C-alpha cells in the first residue's frame, strides 16, 4: 500500500502575537492528517512563541508533530524559511506566514492536486482579507510553462512564496533558497526560477489561503539598504534568466520585470532616496511596455523629478 504524502508546514515567527492564535488554530485544524509543523523563532521579542505553544495544547493529537526551531540571532524572513526547510522531513513543503490563516480543508486539496498531477509545485487562489472585507483573488497558471514564467516575471501572476505546496526533494536538489537578507524580494527571486525548473506546476481552483493585510501594513518606508537588496534581487534573477539555453524567450519579460521592480522601489523608498531609484533601469522604454497606465504615468512623473507628487500618489492611492 502506498504511503500517504507527508507535508511540512514551515512558519517563520516574529512579532506575531496579535495574529498567531488564529494562524496556528487554522493549521492545527487542517482536515489532512499527515502534517508536521516547523515554527522558526527568529528571535521574536514578544510573546508569539509562548502563545503558539498555549494554542497547541488545545490540539493534543497534533502536539507531537509540532517543532519550534530557535535562531540564535534575528536573521530575517528568507533565512527563516531556509531553516524551516532544512528541519523538515515531509515529502512536500508548505511555506506560510504567521499572520495569515488557512481554510480547514486547504492542505487536503493541495495534496490531492499533487497526487493527481505529480507536480513539483502546487498553488491555489487566495482571499485578500482587510478588516471585515474579504476579496477572492483568482490567479492564472497557463498550461504552457514558459508563458507562466513570463507572467511571473511581469507580475501578471502572483509571485508569493507562501501558499505553495512544493516538493521538498525538488527544493533541495536544485538548492532553491533565497540568499539571506533578501527579505523584501525573496518571492521574486525564487518563484520564477522554481517555475522554470519545475517539471510541472499545478493549481487548485479554489481560494484556500486567507492573506491578511492590516491598516498601515502596506505603507512602510524602508531604508536605503532595503532598496539595494531589492535591486540586487533583480540582478540575481537576470543572471539566471540570461544564462539559460532559452534566454531569448524571456528577454522582453525581463525588461518589463525591471520596470515593475522600479515601481516597487518607489513604493518602498523614502522621498530622499528617489534619486537612487530614478537611476535604475533607464535604458528600458516605459511607454512601449505592457505596464498598466497608472504605473507608466508614475514612472514618467518620477522621471520628471516630481518627487513630492509621486510620493503623495504612492501613499494615498493604490498603484
Question: What spans do the regions from the language model cover?
Answer:
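Alpha-solenoid repeat scaffolds
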Residues: 59-62, 178, 248, 287-292
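Polar/charged side chains located within well-ordered beta-strands of beta-rich proteins
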Residues: 43, 71, 164, 258-261, ...
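All-alpha amphipathic helical-bundle segments outside canonical DNA-binding/catalytic cores
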Residues: 247-256
Amino acid at each position: 500500500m502506498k504511503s500517504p504524502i507527508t507535508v511540512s508546514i514551515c512558519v517563520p515567527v516574529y512579532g506575531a502575537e496579535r495574529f498567531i492564535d488564529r494562524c496556528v488554530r487554522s493549521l492545527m485544524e487542517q482536515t489532512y492528517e499527515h502534517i508536521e509543523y516547523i515554527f522558526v523563532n527568529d528571535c521574536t521579542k514578544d510573546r508569539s512563541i509562548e502563545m503558539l505553544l498555549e494554542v497547541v495544547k488545545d490540539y493534543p493529537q497534533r502536539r507531537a508533530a509540532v517543532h519550534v526551531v530557535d535562531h540564535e540571532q534575528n536573521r530575517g524572513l528568507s533565512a527563516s524559511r531556509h531553516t524551516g526547510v532544512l528541519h523538515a522531513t515531509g515529502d512536500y513543503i508548505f511555506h506560510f506566514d504567521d499572520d495569515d490563516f488557512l481554510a480547514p480543508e486547504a492542505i487536503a486539496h493541495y495534496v490531492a492536486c499533487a497526487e493527481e498531477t505529480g507536480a513539483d509545485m502546487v498553488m491555489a487562489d487566495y482571499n485578500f482579507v482587510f478588516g471585515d472585507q474579504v476579496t477572492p483573488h483568482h490567479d492564472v497558471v497557463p498550461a504552457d510553462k514558459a508563458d507562466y514564467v513570463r507572467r511571473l516575471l511581469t507580475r501578471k501572476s502572483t509571485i508569493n512564496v507562501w501558499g505553495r505546496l512544493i516538493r521538498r526533494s525538488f527544493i533541495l536538489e536544485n538548492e532553491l533558497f533565497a540568499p539571506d537578507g533578501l527579505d523584501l524580494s525573496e518571492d521574486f527571486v525564487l518563484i520564477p526560477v522554481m517555475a522554470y525548473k519545475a517539471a510541472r506546476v499545478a493549481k487548485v481552483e479554489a481560494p484556500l489561503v486567507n492573506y491578511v493585510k492590516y491598516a498601515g501594513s502596506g505603507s512602510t518606508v524602508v531604508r536605503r539598504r532595503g532598496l539595494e537588496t531589492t535591486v540586487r534581487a533583480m540582478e540575481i534573477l537576470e543572471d539566471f534568466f540570461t544564462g539559460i539555453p532559452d534566454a531569448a524567450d524571456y528577454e522582453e519579460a525581463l525588461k518589463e520585470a525591471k520596470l515593475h521592480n522600479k515601481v516597487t522601489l518607489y513604493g518602498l523608498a523614502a522621498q530622499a532616496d528617489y534619486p537612487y531609484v530614478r537611476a535604475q533601469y533607464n535604458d528600458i522604454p516605459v511607454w512601449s511596455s505592457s505596464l498598466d497606465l497608472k504605473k507608466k504615468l508614475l514612472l514618467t512623473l518620477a522621471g520628471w523629478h516630481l518627487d513630492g507628487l509621486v510620493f503623495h500618489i504612492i501613499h494615498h492611492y493604490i498603484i
